[in-house]
Amino acid sequence: GIPNASPTLADNSVSFRVINQIFEGLYRLDKNGKPALALAASEPEEKDGGKTLIFKIREDANWSNGDPVTGHDFEYAWKKVVDPKTAAAYGPQMEEIVKNATQILKGEMSPDELGIKALDDKTLQIELENPVPIFKELLTTGTFFPQNQAFVEKQGDRYGTKSDTLISNGPYKLENWNGTNMTWDYVKNPTYWDKKNVPTEKIHVTVVKDTNAALNLYNTNKLDRVELDGEFVKQYKDDKNFHKEATGRSVYMKMNQGKDGVKTDLANLNLRRGLAMAIDKTGMVNTLLANGSKALNGDVPGDIMFDPETKEDFRKQNGDLLKFDQQEATNAWKQGLKEIGKTELTLTLTSGDTSLQRKQTEFIQNQLEENLPGLTIKLKNVTNQASFQADVTQDFELLLGGWGGDYQDPLTYLNLFLTNSPGNHTGFSDAKYDELVLGAKGKLSADPEKRWQALLEAEQILLKDNAVLIPLYQGGRAYLQKSNLKNYTTYPIGSENYKWIEKN
């Protein structure tokens, strides 16, 4: 199902995928993954060396209830995102970038001081702390989308929890979603400014947890696209409608070191290092997934982001930070047990409950118990919604998670583990790490090479020095898609785009 469809509160890839079809911001990624003008009528007028941007909003941009989209809708939405009372998971996206966002998020300034202002209904002024190379990409993501204040306030807490409590300004409207059901429809939005380029009247979505069941629906023409893994890839790899591609999804396990001042056993670095080096990722990727995923020994995935000067891949540059090493894992683990005065430990691993997630967690359980003496792993497979919830409330010991990234820059991965990031949920906090990552968001923007070095160093601190995560793999995507389905647009990083989808 959909955890929620409010752009302010969204904190997971499922919600953002929905938001991307029914809402729109100043820019939208084009078919090649580059930001293209959307609600912005033209590129902004720049003042003060690029620190002030003035956007004209399209005259024909409207909400699905007929209201025009205005600068006030942006001003309202952005101020809500940085308001500490909202506790938006993505508030920190604006920190060090939009003027005063950092102080507002800390509660030192009022949200009204944020550097955004509607000069009139169709003119929007944005003030930045620093002109940032990734700002246009950020504007294509849900956190920076407008919201209709009158509608949102009328709905109150119900806003975005089912299709009746939403209005849209994007290519589609969401229909037939009651908040918990596993099917819904995207229906073409008649008030969308670019509706002439939206060829499809209706897209029906069904959530199918079991790949076998999904294949049956595909083979009986009830589904047009189905994602595959494991033995199904081997079975269908020669089918003319089979496709495989790499993505920018970084999949890892989080370890809970403690919260609210109460530490767990996993606050011990050696135990974390032992866990992080005890899984044969290549085995997992080749046998279980077989979908184009690759073993990953860092947080930032490979082949997508490159050094601005040398053009070298970030992942290759930073190398393997935590890789499978049975001997080293066992040694670190034994040392850690000694340090906490125990001879055995039981840990629970929380994850979603699709057939693939069950297979993965069984594989992980097997590897960890086999390679780390005295360890028992219990599995807790719950709905994806419950798994997101466990992450958000930091109510887990080990959690199978990951991050798809929002824009093509290492910052989108490393940002998550800042001390005050609402997406952190590990108990990790490191002053040097914060300094490097905040620098890369803000004041190092003017020196791309120095900024890049800061990001490389931050990842080393996160994994080599602190073993905050157990990196597993860079996600791939294998799927069958009917040959008459065209323009289903996906990107290595960022939400799919259904705007141009058509079926002949």
Walk through the language-model features, giving the residues of each.
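Long beta-strand-rich cores associated with HINT superfamily self-processing modules
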Residues: Y479-N504
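Alpha-helical secondary-structure segments
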Residues: T70-H72, Y76-A77, T123-Q125, P171, ...
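Surface-exposed binding/hinge segments that line
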Residues: E75, A89-A150
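Gly/Pro-rich hinge or "lid" segments in bacterial periplasmic/extracellular proteins
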Residues: L128-V198, K202
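Structural transition elements
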Residues: K294-G336, L356-R358
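N-terminal lobe/hinge region of extracytoplasmic solute-binding protein
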Residues: G1-D48, I167
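Ligand-site clamp/hinge motif
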Residues: P190-Q235
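Extracytoplasmic/peripheral linker and loop segments enriched in polar/acidic and small residues
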Residues: G374-S387, L414-K482, N504
